[in-house]
Amino acid sequence: EMTYLNRLVRFKNPLPSPITKHYDWPGLYKPFDHQQITSEFLSLHPKAFCFNEAGTGKTSSVLWSADYLMNLGLIKKVLVICPLSIMHSAWQNDIFNTCMHRTSAICHGSATKRKTIIEGDFDFTIINYDGVGIIKKEIKEANFDLIVIDEANAYKSTSTSRWKIINKILTDSCS
């Protein structure tokens, strides 16, 4: 309800997210205060950047926010776009350690395999930057409720094909 109020009325300071009071923070590790603040911010803003320093637990903060929004029924499917090198080591491992009750899949391999995974019933689907271009139509049709772009600097130039593809997906004009 408070999140809905924040979207309806523009307050000078946003109302506190219920995540800080009404969430159990699952996982092997309990969040630090700054991770709770980050999760609160992300759960209140439908479009947001997270510029926390390296090593501050941004991935877990994102996962807790997504899990909280899933618990509320506000989102169902999350697409994580990240470098190939951290699909397993960071994202899938952190999902297991933070939200072990959620399902996840690595979307990598042939176009056919990627399509099958994208069409699957997973809470979190993890794909690398270049994989997005291979199955952009299927990604659009999958109707992800939340898209997380890790290390968004890979999309900083509007002249690259990566940026153009993700822009089409996000602006509902993918053909």
Positions of predicted regions on the chain:
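Interdomain "pre-motor" coupling segment immediately N-terminal to P-loop NTPase/helicase cores
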Residues: E1-N13
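SF2 helicase/translocase NTPase motor core
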Residues: R10-E40, L44-K47, T56-C174
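The Walker A (P-loop) glycine that initiates the GxxxxGKT/S ATP-binding motif of P-loop NTPases
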Residues: N52
